């Protein structure tokens, strides 16, 4: 399923709700859905606020699919090239709560099994994959 969305927070939430419904209909565990919803909201918000700078006239795509035991969410936008996966892994500590930025990708990595970025034909493509048999990252 592919959603064509305007760059607004409301459209990000529409994508999250659509993904949740699709996942429920396909028998995905509620803990997994919760994590995927957080990851999609984080990535979608970054597309809207950073890549497309909150310009509601701009559009981006969210593609959602379940293929066997893989659940895939792909976000595509035509904003400036930016690879969020290039951020180094960091351990979260309570004292880091006041530090600005950079933590969203850590959240996304926590709730997915694979995060891949590519630049294809002028588009940022961020692909989030969750293996549905894996519960280790959900705890």
Where are these regions (language model features)?
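Heptad-repeat coiled-coil signal-transmission/dimerization helices
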Residues: 12, 16-19, 108
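Conserved beta-strand-loop-beta-strand hairpin that lines the nucleotide-binding pocket
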Residues: 1-2, 48-139
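Short, structured helix-loop boundary elements
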Residues: 9-12, 33, 37, 57, ...
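Conserved short strand/loop->alpha-helix "switch" segment adjacent to the catalytic nucleotide/phosphoryl-transfer site
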Residues: 17-41, 97-100
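STAS-typified acidic loop motif
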Residues: 2-14
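Hydrophobic residues in the alpha-helical elements that line and stabilize the ATP-binding pocket
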Residues: 43, 47
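Acidic-residue sensor for enzyme active/binding pockets
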Residues: 41-42, 74
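Structural signature of the histidine kinase catalytic ATP-binding subdomain
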Residues: 7-10, 28-31, 55, 66
């Amino acid at each position: 399923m592919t959603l064509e969305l305007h760059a607004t927070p409301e459209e990000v939430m529409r994508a999250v709700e659509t993904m949740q419904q699709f996942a429920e209909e396909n028998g995905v565990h509620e803990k997994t859905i919760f994590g995927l919803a957080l990851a999609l909201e984080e990535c979608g918000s970054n597309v809207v606020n950073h890549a497309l700078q909150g310009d509601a006239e701009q559009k981006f795509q969210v593609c959602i699919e379940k293929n066997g035991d893989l659940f895939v969410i792909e976000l595509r936008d035509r904003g400036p090239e930016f690879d969020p996966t290039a951020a180094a892994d960091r351990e979260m500590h309570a004292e880091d709560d006041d530090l600005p930025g950079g933590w969203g990708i850590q959240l996304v990595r926590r709730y997915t099994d694979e995060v891949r970025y590519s630049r294809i034909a002028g588009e940022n493509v961020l692909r989030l994959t969750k293996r549905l048999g894996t519960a280790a990252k959900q705890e």
